[in-house]
Amino acid sequence: MYNRVVLKLSGEALAGEQGYGIDPTVIQSIAKQIKEITELNIEVAVVVGAGNIWRGMAGSAQGMDRATADYMGMLATVMNSLALQDSLEAIGVESRVQTSIEMRQVAEPYIRRKAIRHLQKKRVVIFAAGTGNPYFSTDTTAALRAAEIEAEVILMAKNNVDGVYNADPRVDDKAQKFDTITYMDVLKDGLQVMDSTASSLCMDNDIPLIVFSIMEEGNIKRAVLGEKIGTTVRGK
């Protein structure tokens, strides 16, 4: 069992079947699953994506300035983070949102030592606004924050896949799922686990990653308890 984890949630996971925005039923289910692992005395930090609201890369592809599009994505992660905080606190889980871009009226600024102190007090810390810099994904944010707070693992909860495959299982019936794989293989084979910056950061800092489906309730707890689930990525 892990003692301190970073949970990476894709923005799309929050949209549920509607595909856009925030599905209250889904976010309440995720909040309950997070509560389950906090009750095991596990320290939990969360990084949320923004794909349910906005994608910087998509805006850039349509002619928008890339940096501007990325900043819009960072703001969208704050909306998702506040929604998750609200769902957590509604069921009695104390939490804090920390943002990489200061907006003191709605959240704390990101301060590493303060984040660690919150975790030690068993508060869930939600890291929002990415790294605060354009051109960096929320996957990279998860890797960076995991290294900074010395998390033991990153739990990557996906909404459309249950692990890492050698091909896209949605289009290739013969795609095979890996139980374990190395970061070097992920980078060498160009597997779509996380972007190369995030993968390299995890590899260099020896942070294992568990990729699994968020759609099956209880999977977060299973991953934390070390049950065989999804795909584990580690080492070189």
UniProtKB/Swiss-Prot annotation:
Binding site for ATP: 8-11, 51, 55, 159, 165, 168
Gene Ontology CC terms, in alphabetical order: cytoplasm
Domain of life the protein comes from: Bacteria
E.C. number: 2.7.4.22
GO biological process: 'de novo' CTP biosynthetic process; UDP biosynthetic process
Pathway assignment: Pyrimidine metabolism; CTP biosynthesis via de novo pathway; UDP from UMP (UMPK route): step 1/1
GO molecular function: ATP binding; UMP kinase activity
Sites where the protein binds UMP: 70, 131-138
Listed InterPro entries: AceGlu_kinase-like_sf, Asp/Glu/Uridylate_kinase, Uridylate_kinase, Uridylate_kinase_bac
Any Pfam family the entry gives: AA_kinase
Known regulation of activity: Allosterically activated by GTP. Inhibited by UTP.
Catalytic EC class: transferase
Region named Involved in allosteric activation by GTP: 16-21
Keyword set, alphabetical order: Allosteric enzyme, ATP-binding, Cytoplasm, Kinase, Nucleotide-binding, Pyrimidine biosynthesis, Transferase
Subcellular location: Cytoplasm
Biological role stated in the UniProt entry: Catalyzes the reversible phosphorylation of UMP to UDP.
NCBIfam families found in the cross-reference section: pyrH_bact
Protein family membership: Belongs to the UMP kinase family.
Quaternary organization: Homohexamer.
Name of protein: Uridylate kinase
Organism, scientific name: Shouchella clausii (strain KSM-K16)
Gene label: pyrH
